[in-house]
Amino acid sequence: MPKLEQRFDYVKIGLASPERIRQWGERTLPNNQVVGEVTKPETINYRTLKPEMDGLFCERIFGPAKDWECHCGKYKRVRHRGIVCERCGVEVTESRVRRHRMGYIKLAAPVTHVWYLKGIPSYMATLLDMPLRDVEQIVYFNAYVVLDPGNADTLSYKQLLTEDQWIEIEDQIYSEDSQLEGIEVGIGAEAVQRLLQDIKLETEAETLREDIGNAKGQKRAKLIKRLRVIDNFVGTGSQTDWMVLSVIPVIPPDLRPMVQLDGGRFATSDLNDLYRRVINRNNRLARLQEILAPEIIVRNEKRMLQEAVDALIDNGRRGRTVVGANNRPLKSLSDIIEGKQGRFRQNLLGKRVDYSGRSVIVVGPKLKMHQCGLPKEMAIELFQPFVIHRLIGQGLVNNIKAAKRLIQRNDPVIWDVLEEVIEGHPVMLNRAPTLHRLGIQAFEPILVDGRAIQLHPLVCPAFNADFDGDQMAVHVPLSIEAQSEARLLMLASNNILSPATGRPIVTPSQDMVLGAYYLTADNPGRQNGAGKYFAGLDDAIMAYEQQQVDLHAYVWVRFDGPVDDGEDDVEPEVETSADGVVTQTYPSRRIRKDADGTLISQYIRTTPGRIIYNKTIQDSLAS
């Protein structure tokens, strides 16, 4: 298979003409035989387990099931590359062509595309300037529509007629003294196709522009909506009747595979069942038309074909949902594309990337703001290439294979090397949805046990994260440039202000506020050890740790530094000893000075909780 490389700027989704759908699947063999049309509902032969010819897995249409081997087995080597077998018509090539070669089903009667009929808004109803309910009645054979009123005064173009009304008019037309002529009515997708073909887009657009100038309110809005749809058709070069399908594309077989299970049974994609329904009904309709079956039977088969194509394109959009085994709804083409688990969001936009991981977040209260706790199990996987490089560089192993063996054995030397590797190597944490630039920030990793990522509580508002089961993704910047940018621009400690408002986004909340309140609160009921004197702050904390005093007990602690407690205006109690030492007692302070007024000592009344709170802040400021 030749390597194809074609650059493009964007992918455009639009309407395809019947000719283009044919081109996707049609190929001409060297013997001038044209292949591409899928005519049989069979998939594989139950005895030979080979794909049936002209079926949904046909090798002539989609390519060989085995590399360099035709269906009948006449050609079986790479040396026969490009030859088309004279007996079976299969091209000798790689089997991977079955991932991109398409086929098509030629319908015995046209059907409407359910997206354009039942979408919101309905483009078909908007273009025809008819209520959606009326268009549905025509499509699903519940009402006739007048395509040409002829010379009948009682009829008008696009008027709906019931079965009884049409029979009555038919009787009048075929009566001997009838003056009626030129009347034409239709039903089903064929009638809708005819109505769409009658629309002259450019003329209609001009008329609408004139009408919009004179219209007001709701009518004007409706005209603008219709003009916008018509302008889009003109702009894209699409024709209105392409919304009615006469050819259906069949996607490549390897994208809807059939695989054999252990017990000899087969598991197959739901699409194969949906395609099979379409082919069966299409073949039955063609046979009924061939034998000139009664109109009512043909019409019923056309309606069933319409419903089968609707289910293939978007199962459940209209009517009863088609279900398979265990009453499970079959997954249609739309279901594969749309939603969070669809092809776009899951596989194209949300690809898994190398050097990334994902885990639940838990609070890391002992971390600094620019740090995150990275599980060892995750870190060794993310930084494996760096660890291997360092192991070889230090001469601990000779090659990559030996290094990987060492890592798999969880050798203790690995963790020392990993510590060296991650030092100064930031990682980026991202929490979906990333609604602003602070949804992804850089942190210095700290190795932790367990399997959860530890996060500093202060950065939670930026990520809009909480610890009730939220997950975050880790990404490793690889190049030196990426690492330096992460450290300088994305480090959490450099993103304190919100880029949207300019206000601080790093604000303590919940546990931090509660903890700060609890440490510094008054609690008259917990006063064990109250009134004791301590020589310094550390002594008071030590006494609390040894359970000599309660966290909220008021104690006296020596502190010779400046104190601002708002008590300078309060008149203290003054005692003077025989040696001239003056003791001044305030409600929260006791100061001793010698006869010259020099400070001997100062004791402040506080709690161990407040000492811990103050010491934590002072230590942070000092570092």
Curated annotation (Swiss-Prot):
Any idea which UniProt keywords this protein has? DNA-directed RNA polymerase, Magnesium, Metal-binding, Nucleotidyltransferase, Transcription, Transferase, Zinc
Reaction catalyzed? RNA(n) + a ribonucleoside 5'-triphosphate = RNA(n+1) + diphosphate
On the tree of life, the source organism's domain of life is Bacteria
What are the annotated GO cellular component locations? DNA-directed RNA polymerase complex
Q: Which NCBIfam families match?
A: PRK02625.1 (NF002729), rpoC1_cyan (TIGR02387)
Self-association and partners:
In cyanobacteria the RNAP catalytic core is composed of 2 alpha, 1 beta, 1 beta', 1 gamma and 1 omega subunit. When a sigma factor is associated with the core the holoenzyme is formed, which can initiate transcription.
Protein name, UniProt field: DNA-directed RNA polymerase subunit gamma
Q: What is the lineage of its organism?
A: Bacteria, Bacillati, Cyanobacteriota, Cyanophyceae, Acaryochloridales
Gene that this sequence comes from: rpoC1
